[in-house]
């Protein structure tokens, strides 16, 4: 399932504009403040959010209306049941309509005005990576937000079946006890620490301890947060994709809505990746390499293909 065309009405600076997309890779080029980021934010809202907010309305007195033309792969015909473009059964025209900021987006088949479930739009699985995200904040095992959730999940998977392991099994208690005594002897001199009885101690959870012990390094022993932004960014993108799969897979109904199964039983999970201002992190060669590296990634153990 791919977005073939957008016709936009009353959305930010893109009011009255239309965009046609290539089936594989698209590059949005233009002057500063011309609306490139707005296009990615529009796609993110359509797929991942329930409604547009006040600042999305070019004219607050008018509704936002987006005509979305989707092109379906052969195996996806029938996803929208008997709704399709009368001139092409592999194409469907959908109107995304929101009358004001206080209501949700409604999706309607353009030709018949039949309401379409937003869960079908979510099958596009759009991943939006804006230019303000800092890769080093997510490429670690000690974060519960963003793409770092996937890395922390790897620790969860390993430890959940090994309940016998205790924190003291991982740490030299004699050395640690001396360290804690030393730290607390200094902290107790701080009046607020002393008044609130706050002291340094070890974590009680194995996962908590391990997530602080493990870091990502290269073969020259440099931590990933000390490497160049290009390396951090290019490694964060596949982690972002895997985090999205993990997030979808953990909710059975969401996963069933997201995947597409053909007649041979092959399961497909479409992914659309939107990178805002990749030139901040990547030189042109790495941008091209990244764009084509993630077109198709096989997971042989589950027969899932990620297609962006």
Language-model-derived ranges and their functions:
Residues 138-144, 148-275, 284:
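Extended helical coiled-coil dimerization/tether regions that scaffold
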Residues 5-7, 18, 65-69, 93-95, ...:
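Beta-strand secondary-structure signal
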Residues 1-48, 221-308:
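Switch/communication elements of ASCE P-loop NTPase nucleotide-binding domains
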Residues 9, 22, 69-73, 132:
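Solvent-exposed residues in well-ordered beta-strands and their adjoining turns
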Residues 2, 15, 62-66, 90-92, ...:
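Residues at beta-strand starts and edge strands
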Residues 54-56, 74-170:
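Glycine-rich phosphate-binding loops of NTPases
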Residues 66-68, 102-109, 212-217:
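Short polybasic amphipathic segments
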Residues 40-87:
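Conserved P-loop NTP-binding catalytic core
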């Amino acid at each position: 399932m791919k977005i073939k065309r957008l016709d936009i009405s009353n959305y930010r600076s893109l009011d009255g504009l239309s965009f046609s997309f290539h089936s594989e890779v698209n590059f949005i080029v233009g002057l500063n403040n011309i609306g490139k980021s707005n296009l990615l934010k529009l796609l993110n809202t359509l797929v991942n959010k329930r409604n547009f907010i006040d600042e999305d309305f070019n004219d607050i007195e008018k509704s936002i209306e987006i005509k979305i033309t989707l092109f379906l792969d052969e195996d996806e015909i029938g996803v929208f049941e008997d709704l399709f473009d009368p001139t092409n059964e592999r194409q469907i025209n959908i109107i995304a309509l929101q009358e004001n900021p206080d209501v949700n987006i409604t999706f309607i088949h353009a030709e018949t005005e039949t309401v379409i479930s937003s869960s079908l739009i979510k099958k596009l699985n759009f991943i939006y990576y804006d230019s303000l995200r800092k890769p080093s904040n997510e490429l670690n095992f000690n974060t519960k937000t963003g793409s770092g959730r996937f890395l922390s999940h790897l620790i969860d998977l390993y430890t959940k079946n090994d309940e016998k392991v205790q924190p003291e099994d991982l740490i030299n208690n004699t050395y640690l006890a001396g360290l804690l005594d030393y730290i607390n002897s200094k902290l107790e001199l701080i009046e607020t620490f002393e008044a609130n009885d706050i002291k340094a101690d070890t974590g009680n959870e194995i996962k908590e301890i391990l997530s602080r012990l493990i870091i990502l390094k290269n073969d020259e022993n440099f931590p990933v947060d000390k490497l160049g932004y290009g390396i951090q960014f290019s490694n964060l993108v596949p982690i972002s994709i895997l985090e999205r799969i993990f997030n979808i897979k953990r909710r059975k109904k969401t996963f069933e809505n997201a995947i597409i199964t053909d007649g041979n039983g092959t399961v497909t999970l479409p992914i659309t990746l939107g990178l805002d201002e990749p030139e901040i992190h990547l030189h042109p060669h790495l941008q091209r390499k990244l764009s084509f590296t993630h077109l198709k990634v096989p997971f042989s153990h589950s027969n899932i293909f990620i297609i962006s």
